[in-house]
Every structure is written in structure tokens, then in C-alpha cells.
From Swiss-Prot:
InterPro entries named in the record: PEBP, PEBP-like_sf, YbhB_YbcL/LppC-like
Signal sequence range: 1-21
Pfam family, one: PBP
Protein name from the UniProt record: UPF0098 protein YbcL
The species this protein was found in: Escherichia coli (strain K12)
Localisation per UniProt entry: Periplasm
Coiled coil: none
Keywords assigned: Disulfide bond, Periplasm, Signal
Family: Belongs to the UPF0098 family.
Superkingdom classification of source: Bacteria
Length: 183
């Protein structure tokens, strides 16, 4: 009987810990699945809608004071990957970004949120655009739970600088990694 009780308690603790895990979901993108053309860049030889997908996160870690979202392609043939989007200073009360939140004018972002400069050269979302014929690229859509309310960056800050600041203030991350290739 004692073993049954201990086993039940351990199972409950394990289930509770798993249920509370920090995670991100989207209605438009899934890990391992091909991005649709709506999330592909418009330019650089690519023809897409250049629209960021919706993102919803849950299981927020204790102590979270703000969030950030990044989109990074580690497979880009640059020697340093490719930053497609950085947005920081999302209030801790926000757990959702709508479709096209990454538009250049920032009108769909929460008050106080700041978009950094992507590797296409502007502040906002830049969709997938791998070289034609290259292997499938992995696009890391990552939500960061942060231990600070504000990351001291602006709309001209590079992805590398934003990434450095996020790593210095990270509590946890949650990620969706779809793929894209142009055959």
C-alpha cells in the first residue's frame, strides 16, 4: 500500500511538472513542417507574404518579468546564421502575438514592445528565404521568458546584440522549428 501511495504521488508530481512546462504554439506553423508562402520573404528572389505567424505561449516560469520573440535560421550560409525577427520588452501579462505582429509599423505589437533590426536590414519580421536548391533550413521561432522588464535595445539593434542581451537575462525558452526550402 505504501508503494502504491508513493508511486501515485510521484506520478502526480511528474504530471504537474510536465503540465507547467513553458511552451509555445501556433495555428500557422509546426515543428518539422514546411512553412507556407505567407511566411516567406518578399524580395531577395523569394515571393511570399512576409507575414509573421501567430504565437501563443503558456506555462510561464515563475519570476518572468517580460518576454521576447526571435526567429533565427542557423542554416543560412553566412557563417553566422540569419536573424529574421527580434522583438523584446513584451509585457509579462501578454502571452499571445497575432498574425502579422511583425509588420514594420509595429501596430500589432503590445505597447512598449520593440522590434530590432533583422538581417534584411529593417526592424520587423523578414520571412524565410533560403538559397534556391539549398538543403531545408530550420527556422527557430523562440519565445524567451526574461528576468528583466526591459532589454536596453532599439529598432536599430542587430540580432546578435539582441541575442546576447536575451541570453544574459533568460529564465527559459520555448521553441517551434518549422522548415523551408526552395527546390
Amino acid at each position: 500500500m505504501k508503494t502504491l501511495i508513493v508511486s501515485t504521488v510521484l506520478a502526480f508530481i511528474t504530471f504537474s511538472a510536465q503540465a507547467a512546462a513553458f511552451q509555445v504554439t501556433s495555428n500557422e506553423i509546426k515543428t518539422g513542417e514546411q512553412l507556407t508562402t505567407s511566411h516567406v520573404f518578399s524580395g531577395f528572389g523569394c515571393e511570399g507574404g512576409n507575414t509573421s505567424p501567430s504565437l501563443t505561449w503558456s506555462g510561464v516560469p515563475e519570476g518572468t518579468k517580460s518576454f521576447a520573440v526571435t526567429v533565427y535560421d542557423p542554416d543560412a550560409p553566412t557563417g553566422s546564421g540569419w536573424w529574421h525577427w527580434t522583438v523584446v520588452n513584451i509585457p509579462a501579462t501578454v502571452t499571445y502575438l497575432p498574425v502579422d505582429a511583425g509588420r514594420r509599423d509595429g501596430t500589432k505589437l503590445p505597447t512598449g514592445a520593440v522590434q530590432g533590426r533583422n538581417d534584411f536590414g529593417y526592424a520587423g519580421f523578414g520571412g524565410a528565404c533560403p538559397p534556391k536548391g539549398d538543403k531545408p533550413h530550420h527556422y527557430q521561432f523562440k519565445v524567451w521568458a526574461l528576468k528583466t522588464e526591459k532589454i536596453p535595445v532599439d529598432s536599430n539593434s542587430s540580432g546578435a546584440l539582441v541575442g546576447y542581451m536575451l541570453n544574459a537575462n533568460k529564465i527559459a525558452t520555448a521553441e517551434i522549428t518549422p522548415v523551408y526550402e526552395i527546390k
